[in-house]
Amino acid sequence: ALRESLEKQWKTEQEKKQQMSALAHDIKTPLTIVRGNAELLSETELTTEQKNNITYVLNGTTQIQSYVKQLIDVTKSWNCSDVTYTTVRLEDFFADIKEQALGLVEIYHQKIDWKAGQSDKKVTIAYDPMFRAVMNVIQNAVEHTKENGIIYIDAKEQDDRLTFIVEDSGSGFTKEALLHGTEQFFMDDTSRNGEAHYGMGLFFAKTVAEKYGGGIKLSNSENTGGARVEIFFLSSQETS
């Protein structure tokens, strides 16, 4: 009876994942149509009120597209067959993340305080999902930091464990966010623009970290007073 119950539960979970994956992809097409038509309308003669309405539509579709992308990333992370393991120099992996993070904060007129351990070691990792997971954590920090704020990133490796600590200079996690911030579709309103924010990014980061032998920890930084996220993964490693 226990075995049948577990098999039924597993089957139900698989069906939910398939439905979520299909839904995410199905949303993309009508969303693209809405955005495309809104962009066409914006090029016609409009009143001030109509222009404002079009702007709201475009901003809304941009936000939804971001959520859909994160949802697709999550569903991809469930599929082991899609993962390619790559052997890279640890310094190169850190450098790739630093480069993308610098490009991200530049858009929001922020700065990065970057610290990374020096190592000639090579690591074998699921590069793409791990890279996206770390960038989701950094994106979350960016969204909760005001212009001219600083994002602190500490990247290190020890005992076959890759760890990234990201601290922002925002208002920090609420009590509710500390408890539920990595849950799918968790919402808070502490983002930089004051709008409700969905926690898909941290949910995806947690999903990937746990899949590769690691985890994620949420806290508030003693240094900045902002949010602190520690994400880590296990990796096989060899000296060069």
Regions found by a protein language model. Name each.
Residues G214-G215:
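Conserved glycine-rich
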Residues F173-F186:
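Short conserved segment of the HATPase_c
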Residues N79-T84, K122-I125:
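Conserved micro-motifs of the catalytic ATP-binding
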Residues D168:
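Acidic ATP/Mg2+-coordinating residue in the GHKL
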Residues N59-I64:
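Short alpha-helical segment of the dimerization/phosphotransfer core of two-component systems
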